[in-house]
Amino acid sequence: MADKIKAWFDAEADYLEVRFSDAAGYEKETKHDAVMERVDKDGQVIGFSVMGVSKFTKGNPLEADLVAA
C-alpha cells in the first residue's frame, strides 16, 4: 500500500483523480462506466479516476472494484 496518495478534483469537468504512485502508467477501462484504473507497466493499479463524480452521494455511492490483470 502507498505511504501517500495524491488526489485532485476538477469541478468544471466533474472529475476526480487519485494516484497511489507517480510511476508511469496508462488508463484502463473498468466494468463501471464512470471509473478508469491507472495501471503501471506490470498491470498493478497505481490509481483511478472517476467521471461525473458529483452524481455520487451518500444515498447513491459509487461502488467499484479495482482489479488489475
Residue ranges and their predicted role:
Residues M1-A69:
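Small, basic N-terminal interaction modules of short regulatory proteins
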